Amino acid sequence: MFSQNMIIRDGEYTKTIYTMIKEERFQDAINTLNTIPESSTTRAGLSLLGHCYYQTQDFIEAANCYEHLLNLVPDVQEYRLYYAQSLFQAGLFEEAQKIIATGLDSPELKEKVLQLQSAIAYGNEDYTAAQSLLLQRQDGNGQEASTKNDEGCLLYQANMYEDALQRYVSALQAGGFNPHVAYNAALCHYRRKENSQALNYIAEIVERGIRNHPELGVGAQAETEGGARSVGNPPALAASGLAQAFNLKAAIEYQEGNADGAREALTDLPPRSEPELDPVTLHNMALTDPTGGGAGLRRLAFLLELGPPACPPETFANLLLLCCKHEMYDTAADILAEHTHLTYKYLSPYLYDLLDALITAQSTPEEAEQKLGTLASSIGGRLRALAAKVQECRSATDQNALRMALREYEGALESYLPVAMARAWIPWRMDDFQGAEREFRASAEFCSETPSWRLHAAHVLFMRGDRYKEAAAFYEPIVRQNYDDILSIPASVLANLCVAYIMTSQNEEAEELMRKVERAEERKGNATGQCLHLCIVNLVIGTLYCAKNNYEFGLSRIAHALDGGSGARLCADTWIHVKRCVLGLLTGMAKQTIVLPSIALQETLNFLRACEAYGLTIPSVLTGPLEDSGEQPPTIGLEARKLRALLLRLMEYK
């Protein structure tokens, strides 16, 4: 690494600087040039600085250098082109267009100028102008691959993914492998839901990137658990297409519901510090952040403030969806109100109507139900028409038409499912589980084979309190499907299934399932962190017995689940079960409707004393992703002490 204290002998500056540029040590070259006063006033110095700044992606500084060069030598057309290119890369499209319009008319540069002009029009989303400029370009002089790629980009923006893919394949055939063109082809496959083909292109990009650029340290973050040294943003990273490839892989994993796989794909990226990350990587890290929504929301809000072209177009919608996911509906409403100009640009009518209904549900549930009902009817009608179309294509044995019809049907179903869930969620949040079940029955026509629909339908039946057998019938296929990897099943599913077995007198099945979970946790050990599956199962079962007024057994089960209150399992998530059950016991004792043996009361006191000791610094409540009141949250230790004091008072009451 170059040091500013490096001594360069007189007469060797030129050799040293050009060696640095040859070795792609552009920042070192910039540092050296900046020690020479003449660099900022001479043609040679400014030319070298402009090139180096451009290669380090400091496009504003590069533009400044080329602007000075134009003042020194206004007749050199190449500098005007480089100036415009730097402005374009900096996102200053209007300024770049002005530079082109003021004298950039060299016949030798015509093709490059047309290419830049079409790129500016494309960046401004003026696709008609971009198409017109593209038609003026010639395919000769090795430009065929570039032209085919640009044609593909325009077709992609028109949602003509199959035609765009053909152009990208032609570009690869005409110009040989190019990671950026290969990425574009992978993106088309992704949009067509052909993930295996997309992953094939991604694998080739990654393989070539690792082979050709070992200095980028692909996978180093995973090997060093995030402690790898940043490689920055060298030209090799931009040329390799690795950032785009890994981000697309993360998107595929995320879309398939594999959040861990998405995070792993992002971890495999060449190591960079957060300020060095490109907007797309920052956006995807926000969506896959495992620590909660706070950091993700802040990252997305930061990107939104950057605005285009730096801000990915999906940012606005994902920020609103993330707010709704964390039940921050007021925040979502504020964002919509503050960015009305983005609403029509980045939100489809469907997504806007869905978000509007979710936000409206907070104040007027009836109006939200009406909006969602209208949306569901519209999509439902389209689904029926598409289902008929699929049947027609099957009868006609037209495989291409069948594939297209199935793709359309799946896309419509993806739109329908969130609406159906939202309609059931409105009565669910008001504890109207019968109403929620009614909504699930209404959507069963289209969604009954969808895993997420079946899971949530099971939850609704379970909460009915008298439909445990039906709930178990929905839970069992989920468990059987992942029986060999039982810890991959949500703990709530296992707990609810055990309770359903107990409530339908299938105690042996419940015990067998719990033994299976216990053995899996023992095998897993502490290698990959704390396992709470068996703990949560026992907590839910204990809560069930407490709800049935069997506090002696219920509280003993809860204490066992939390290792007597002295283990690492004591946290806000688990403490809430303890609080509810102990408060239920205290209420019953105060009303003199519950009597517990002295030994059971003493065990409860010992359990609360252990929680008090081990929970002194553990927050007792879960906070929202952006909650920061400045006040210290209550702790488990403090609440356990209060509960113990109340229990002692009631025990002394005669």
Curated annotation (Swiss-Prot):
Q: Name one Pfam family in it.
A: TPR_16
Q: Which GO terms describe its biological process?
A: intraciliary transport; protein polyglutamylation
Q: Which GO terms describe its molecular function?
A: intraciliary transport particle B binding
- Does the keyword field hold Repeat? yes
InterPro entries, sorted: TPR-like_helical_dom_sf, TPR_rpt, TT30
Q: Where located? A: Cell projection, Cilium
GO CC annotations?
axonemal microtubule; cilium; intraciliary transport particle B
The record's TPR repeats, renumbered to this chain, cover 10-43, 44-76, 145-178, 180-212, 393-426, 452-485, 535-568
Signal peptide start and end residues: none
Major place of residence: other
Which keywords does this chain's UniProt record carry?
Cell projection, Cilium, Cilium biogenesis/degradation, Repeat, TPR repeat
Report the family membership: Belongs to the TTC30/dfy-1/fleer family.
Record's function text: Required for polyglutamylation of axonemal tubulin in sensory cilia. Plays a role in anterograde intraflagellar transport (IFT), the process by which cilia precursors are transported from the base of the cilium to the site of their incorporation at the tip.
**Protein name (database record):** Tetratricopeptide repeat protein 30 homolog
The species this protein belongs to is: Anopheles gambiae (African malaria mosquito)
